[in-house]
């Protein structure tokens, strides 16, 4: 699959057919626990699907805010971008491909599938982590089907935990078992609140960023996930010019993770 097709498929996937089990609106936001009023709210923004284009990744490096980049394994620029992004002071995660409900969407190389046995799951996780050795955590790429498979997600998270990595459930399914399983394994973990760019319309992305800000104020912190689109960069730039955002700092994902 070429880079353009990959990015287009990723965008369309998030636009509805990804879930297969829930309404489109529930893909956008997930409510967390009410925040402690004595804690200052924070926003952590993850940029997914990194690894297929140098320019698309680099456009985020000059935003002058802490960002976390989730890098796909076995992509043309996986290793190069992991090093470059880390050198800029940003955090790096492994973007672990997992099976979606819609079989027309290819999660890409190094993916995990329903029915995979423990040996295959552990082997793939080991190989993918070795592809992104600077990773401090993992989140799922696609995975609306795989994250609903209790045995398989348990094996995957156990393998991730053995490397002392945290896990962020991207919540591509409202029935995902990933976060609950991670908690039972006593892993450092959390889950996505808002996908900011399921639509590439800049005004819609800006609206999602404001939604992310509201989540942070209400729950103490919020985790957003975006993708390497030019529209996403421009919307973030516009969002940062809003004086009302200055009281809610962007932080790296590690700053909001908890056990």
Predicted regions and their residues:
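Catalytic domains of cell-wall/extracellular-matrix polysaccharide-remodeling enzymes
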Residues: 118-209, 215, 227-249, 256
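Substrate-binding cleft of extracellular glycoside hydrolase catalytic domains
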Residues: 88-134
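Active-site beta->alpha N-cap acidic-glycine motif
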Residues: 36-104
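A generic structural motif
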Residues: 71-72, 97, 247-259
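Hydrophobic faces of well-ordered beta-strands that scaffold small-molecule active sites
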Residues: 43-47, 67-69, 92-94, 167-169, ...
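N-terminal secretory signal peptides and thylakoid transit peptides that target proteins
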Residues: 1-22, 26
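Short, well-ordered coil/turn segments that N-cap beta-strands
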Residues: 41-43, 65-67, 88-90, 133-136, ...
């Amino acid at each position: 699959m070429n880079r353009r097709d990959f990015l287009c498929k990723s965008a369309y996937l998030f636009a509805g057919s990804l879930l297969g089990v829930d309404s489109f609106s529930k893909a956008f936001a997930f409510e967390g626990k009410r925040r402690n009023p004595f804690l200052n709210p924070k926003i952590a923004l993850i940029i997914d699907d990194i690894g297929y284009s140098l320019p698309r990744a680099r456009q985020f490096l000059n935003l002058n805010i802490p960002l976390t980049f989730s890098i796909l394994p076995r992509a043309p620029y996986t290793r190069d971008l992991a090093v470059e992004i880390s050198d800029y002071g940003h955090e790096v995660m492994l973007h672990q491909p997992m099976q979606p409900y819609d079989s027309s969407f290819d999660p890409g190389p190094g993916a995990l599938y329903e029915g995979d046995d423990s040996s295959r799951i552990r082997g793939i996780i080991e190989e993918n982590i070795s592809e992104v050795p600077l990773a401090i955590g993992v989140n799922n790429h696609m995975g609306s089907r795989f994250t609903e498979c209790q045995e398989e997600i348990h094996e995957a998270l156990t393998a991730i935990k053995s490397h002392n990595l945290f896990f962020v459930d991207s919540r591509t399914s409202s029935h995902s078992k990933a976060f609950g399983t991670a908690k039972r394994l006593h892993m450092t973990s959390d889950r996505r609140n808002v996908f900011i760019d399921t639509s590439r319309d800049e005004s819609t992305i800006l609206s999602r960023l404001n939604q992310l800000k509201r989540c942070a104020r209400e729950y103490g912190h919020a985790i957003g996930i975006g993708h390497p689109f030019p529209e996403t960069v421009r919307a973030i730039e516009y969002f940062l010019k809003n004086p009302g955002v200055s009281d809610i700092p962007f932080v790296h994902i590690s700053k909001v993770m908890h056990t």
